[in-house]
Amino acid sequence: MSIFDFTREPISITKPIRLIELFAGYGSQAMVLKRMGAKFEHHRVVEFDKYAIASYNAVHGTDFPTMDITKVHAEDLNICDTNAFTYLLTYSFPCTDLSVAGKQAGMSKGSGTRSGLLWEVERILTEIRDSNGELPQILFMENVPQVHSQDNMPDFRKWLDFLESLGYTNYYQDLNAKNYGVAQNRERCFMFSFLGEYNYHFPQPIPLKKKLKDYLEDNVDEKYYINNEKADKLIKQLIDNGTLPQHNLDRQTDRQTDRQTDLR
């Protein structure tokens, strides 16, 4: 317990939720809200990748077009009537340049990295403020823990300072899926920002009652197995030539060129 437990009002949502997802992917954060039983409206979705938005629409029964975050402006989000609605804006930007599995090029403003697309969110929120518009009451971000590593902390601190300048109170913490009832060792940084001075606590750990074997099937259809002949051919080509078959390479290149988000 801290002094803020006494001086700040606990956050509570009493109005209908309008969800705005930037870097939406296939809508995993909307899926979580549904699993929680939350009632909400898919208000706006910003996703550049055509495959991801097709998946989003198929999963959620929506019909959103692709949108480029670099071309989105304040008016495109259509945030209005905040007295009647709670706007929840998610912005889980690409972790590509932060993850230990990537090149760790960082997220500095103007760096041109995919993780640097975070600052497009700054631009949009600044446009809202400067036009005397209505800011979303809740912001949510999920990313790899390296988002606040020693190397990235200066940029992360700039981001926190910017949000505080708009009137947000920020809470962030690294949480691991294995501590919340899921048989997976997956650590991520979660951050909530509330417009105003509100108190918030991240949930307490949940005992793990399932193991990986509980999710596995005893009998699996043959179609889910890799064909040995094709696998051997692929491995041989990789060893001999160091290349993938061209049709697979073209498809992957197309996807990588189109994406602004990673489907975490």
Show which residues each predicted segment covers.
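Conserved SAM-binding loop
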Residues: Y56
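Short, structured coil segments at secondary-structure junctions
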Residues: K39, V59-H60
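Conserved acidic residues
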Residues: D49, P65-H73, D174-K178
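Accessory recognition modules or surfaces
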Residues: S2-I17, T62, A183-N185, C189-F194
